[in-house]
Amino acid sequence: PFDFVEGRDVGTFNLAGNVSLKDQFGGIDDFWAECIGLSDSAAGGSVRCVWRSLKGEKAYSVLSGQPLKEGVKVIGEFVGGTGSLKGATGTFTFTWTSTFIDKDQGMFTGHTKDLSGSYQIP
């Protein structure tokens, strides 16, 4: 945690995990995602993610304003990519179905459902 206004939890974080898609995104259905972000219990957060395919292709996304807690619907935006995902744009949503935060260890664990969205690749 970052020493900020009393009663307001602020901190930076890193998240990483598998994104397994039911429908392919640019011909790919399995990614490893890594994200960095700033979380503010009063204002939400700002997150930047890189989704990497097994072949090394990347999709870049931005998430903002949503707290990391169960039941929250997250809205994301694709802002580019590499390889077959170069120039990818679009939006997506998902819902946190379970979350666990261990502030002492600086760990977050979460699971999502209902990942859906639309995209364009030039």
Predicted features along the sequence, with ranges:
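Beta-strand-enriched cores of mature, soluble protein domains
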Residues: 1-122
